[in-house]
Curated annotation (Swiss-Prot):
The lineage of its organism: Eukaryota, Metazoa, Spiralia, Lophotrochozoa, Mollusca. It comes from Conus bullatus. Disulfide bonds join C56-C68, C57-C74, C64-C75. This is Mu-conotoxin BuIIIB. Residues 26-46 are annotated as: Disordered. Residues 23-51 form a propeptide. Changing G53A: 5-fold increase in blocking SCN3A (K(d) is 36 nM). The cysteine framework is III (CC-C-C-CC).
Length: 78
């Protein structure tokens, strides 16, 4: 009887951590499409617009990406 309980306890202790811990596929970093759907980018957030504009201007014309050209005066916005 005790050996059966020991075997059952050993099996439970070995199997439980394998299922209780998150697997690698469950991490948000492994699912970029889902992560990007929930992400609020700085392009859509007016609170971050000033900081992004400052970063564009610090880099001069070299740092002018598409967003900077559309939103920053130093990159050609009128």
């Amino acid at each position: 009887m005790m050996s059966k309980l020991g075997v059952l306890l050993t099996i439970c202790l070995l199997l439980f951590p394998l299922f209780a811990l998150p697997q690698d596929g469950d991490q948000p970093a492994d699912r970029p499409a889902e992560r990007m759907q929930d992400d609020i980018s700085s392009e859509q957030n007016p609170l971050l617009e000033k900081r992004v504009g400052e970063r564009c201007c610090k880099n001069g014309k070299r740092g002018c990406g598409r967003w900077c050209r559309d939103h920053s005066r130093c990159c050609g916005r009128r």
